[in-house]
């Protein structure tokens, strides 16, 4: 009889532990979902999307790199101004001030897997009509058509995120706009080259994705990319 009571007690403990584990998982999942919806204004404000200045409040290091890059002045630099006859030619704007590379001018989202992005022509990318001085900003490369911020990593964030590691680690992403360079790159790979655009133009850096409190406490250091382009 004593052995039966011991066995019964063990089964009860295991059931209780399983219930606690499931409850903890559900609690954490619900908590993460609540956190993701904490600041919806970080991904959309009416008809406009927030600019890179909003991103700088948390992604301090990345913003400071981007603001000194050629992507940040893709609209304001003198060469672009002259070549477009003082911004008269509008067909270039999709790549120089993109609303997001994940949406075409027709409003249709690009292939969510990222595969179809390489066939999206630069003149088909929807250009934005606001915050032009930001050039190719954060949202241009990271904001999806359904207002989720995509990137190569996942993590707890006050806005919706989506991990698309394959897309952000391949040269096809850069080839959406850098079409002439992409042709040179394809010739390079046909000759046996293996390095991606990111490996050369976005050096690896080990750091936390976020530098602001309290969010940085929720992130471990990991290998990311410098946004100096």
Predicted feature locations:
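Post-signal peptide N-terminal segment of mature Sec-exported envelope proteins
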Residues: 41-58
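Primarily the internal scaffold of c-type cytochrome electron-transfer domains
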Residues: 34-46, 63-83, 87, 101-229
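N-terminal secretory signal peptides that target proteins for export/translocation
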Residues: 1-12
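Signature of short aromatic-glycine-proline-rich micro-motifs recurring in repeat-based ectodomains
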Residues: 92-93
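C-terminal motif of bacterial Sec signal peptides marking the signal peptidase cleavage site
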Residues: 29-31
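Hydrophobic core
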Residues: 22-27
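Sec-dependent signal peptide recognition
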Residues: 15-21
């Amino acid at each position: 009889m004593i052995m039966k009571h011991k066995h019964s007690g063990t089964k009860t403990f295991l059931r209780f532990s399983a219930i606690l584990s499931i409850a903890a998982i559900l609690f954490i999942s619900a908590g993460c979902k609540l956190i993701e919806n904490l600041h919806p204004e970080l991904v959309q404000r009416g008809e406009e999307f927030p600019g890179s200045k909003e991103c700088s409040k948390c992604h301090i290091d990345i913003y400071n790199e981007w603001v000194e890059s050629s992507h940040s002045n893709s609209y304001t630099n003198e060469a672009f101004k002259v070549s477009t006859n003082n911004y008269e030619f509008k067909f270039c704007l999709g790549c120089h001030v993109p609303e997001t590379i994940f949406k075409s001018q027709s409003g249709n989202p690009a292939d969510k897997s990222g595969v179809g992005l390489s066939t999206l022509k630069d003149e088909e990318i929807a250009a934005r009509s606001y915050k032009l001085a930001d050039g190719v900003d954060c949202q241009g490369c990271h904001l999806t058509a359904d207002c989720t911020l995509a990137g190569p990593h996942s993590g707890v964030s006050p806005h919706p995120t989506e991990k698309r590691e394959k897309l952000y680690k391949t040269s096809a992403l850069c080839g959406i706009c850098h079409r002439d360079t992409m042709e040179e790159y394809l010739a390079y790979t046909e000759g046996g080259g293996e390095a991606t655009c990111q490996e050369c133009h976005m050096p690896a850096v080990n750091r936390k994705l976020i530098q602001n409190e309290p969010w940085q406490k929720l992130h471990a250091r990991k290998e990311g990319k410098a946004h100096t382009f």
